Amino acid sequence: MADGEVIEADLFIDCSGFRGLFINQALGVEFEDWSHWLPCNRAIAVPCERSEDFTPYTRSTAHGAGWQWRIPLQHRTGNGHVFSTRFMDDAEAEKILLANIDGEPLADPFKVDFKAGKRRQLWHKNCVAVGLAGGFLEPLESTSLHLVQSGIIRLVRLLPDGGFNPANVAEFNRQSDFEYERIRDFIILHY
């Protein structure tokens, strides 16, 4: 801890987001960068007034260097432009976003940087990475909540009653790799 306190546990679940405080910073598990397959690495988002055209679905629209989402909610509409900074700058991406929203913006646009990929191992030693600490696939298919839930279910199924069985750890990592790779390949098909 920052104050020098040491915390001991049989198992740590790293839910610390993109930083991966335990899995990456403490244990050094590397991140597999999948940007050569999924080049989008930034999103600019802005809420706007809800349109009278309230649709019960999310709309995804292709653009030159990425795509735009429109998510109608009860009191507003969520909008965002996901793009690759190798092919478009922020100013152009924001201009495209604001030109294609259905109402007046309710806030200033904000940007979110991300890198598509996953940790080489989601379970290493006595640490299991869940959620963004384990990996992120671009938001075209919103799989983050699914990956958290399936990771926890997988952990519960494979968690031994005492000690860590290397076969269970290996199986957890194998199943996690397979799931991330299947989702990655599905997203690639969109492009």
Can you describe what each PLM-predicted range is?
Residues 127-129:
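Residue-level marker for buried hydrophobic side chains located in beta-strands
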Residues 55, 116-118:
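A short, acidic/glycine-rich surface segment
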Residues 21-25, 140, 181-185:
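A short acidic (Asp/Glu
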Residues 4, 115, 177-178:
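Short, internal active-site loops enriched in acidic
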Residues 1-5, 118-125:
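A short acidic-Thr-Gly-centered motif at the start of a beta-strand
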Residues 154-191:
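Active-site-proximal substrate-binding core of FAD-dependent oxidoreductases
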Residues 1-99, 152:
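Predominantly flavin-linked oxidoreductase catalytic cores and closely associated redox partners
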Residues 63-115, 133-147, 158-165:
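Conserved FAD/dinucleotide-binding core of flavoprotein oxidoreductases
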